């Protein structure tokens, strides 16, 4: 019953304890992002020469905090808000098409995926950095029939 999970844990432990350089390459790591927010614009689908198409949209997340004394316990005080905008890219063929057809401005979504930092050259031949969330899963929290 526990043989398989124990073996997996032992293998991970053995990799961490080994001084072999190959084991460092096999070490587990994680790049996981979960965002809960609202869509800022209807998605667009882009396709670069010879590459797979991608659906892209922006997602806003908000942080709220109360300023003033006794921030946690007092209802008085100013409520502050910070909005962060995230660029979401969807490459998976089935999910990409669903996102393009059904994600709408104002919709509330839960997006799961990974964060990616990349570089590109703009039309003025200037190198730019771009951060994007590569979506693996999208959960619609707004009814697709509702207009947000």
Curated annotation (Swiss-Prot):
Query: Where is it located?
Result: Mitochondrion; Mitochondrion matrix, Mitochondrion nucleoid
A molecular-function term among this protein's GO annotations: enzyme activator activity
An example GO BP is: protein homotetramerization
Keywords of the record, alphabetical order, are: DNA replication, DNA-binding, Mitochondrion, Mitochondrion nucleoid, Transit peptide
State the superkingdom: Eukaryota
Transit peptide limits: 1-17
Q: Does the keyword Ribosomal protein apply?
A: no
* Stretches assigned to the SSB domain: 30-142
- Its chief place of residence is mitochondrion
Query: Can you list the GO cellular component terms from the UniProt entry?
Result: mitochondrial nucleoid; mitochondrion
The record describes its quaternary structure and partners as:
Homotetramer.
PANTHER family tied to this protein: SINGLE-STRANDED DNA-BINDING PROTEIN (PTHR10302), SINGLE-STRANDED DNA-BINDING PROTEIN, MITOCHONDRIAL (PTHR10302:SF0)
Output the HAMAP family linked to this UniProt entry. Answer: SSB
> What is its biological role?
Binds preferentially and cooperatively to pyrimidine rich single-stranded DNA (ss-DNA). Required to maintain the copy number of mitochondrial DNA (mtDNA) and plays crucial roles during mtDNA replication that stimulate activity of the DNA polymerase at the replication fork. May also function in mtDNA repair.
Name recorded for this polypeptide: Single-stranded DNA-binding protein 1-B, mitochondrial
- Native source species: Xenopus laevis (African clawed frog)
């Amino acid at each position: 019953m526990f043989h398989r999970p124990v073996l997996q844990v032992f293998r991970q432990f053995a990799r961490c304890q080994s001084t072999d350089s190959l084991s460092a390459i096999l070490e587990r790591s994680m790049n996981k992002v979960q965002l809960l927010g609202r869509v800022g614009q209807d998605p667009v689908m882009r396709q670069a020469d010879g590459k797979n198409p991608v659906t892209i949209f922006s997602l806003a997340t908000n942080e709220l905090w109360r300023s003033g004394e006794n921030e946690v316990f007092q209802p008085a005080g100013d409520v502050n808000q910070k909005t962060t905008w995230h660029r979401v890219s969807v490459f998976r063929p089935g999910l990409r098409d669903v996102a393009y057809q059904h994600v709408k401005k104002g919709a509330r979504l839960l997006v799961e995926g990974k964060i990616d930092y990349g570089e590109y050259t703009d039309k003025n031949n200037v190198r730019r950095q771009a951060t994007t969330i590569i979506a693996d899963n999208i959960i619609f929290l707004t009814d697709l029939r509702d207009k947000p």
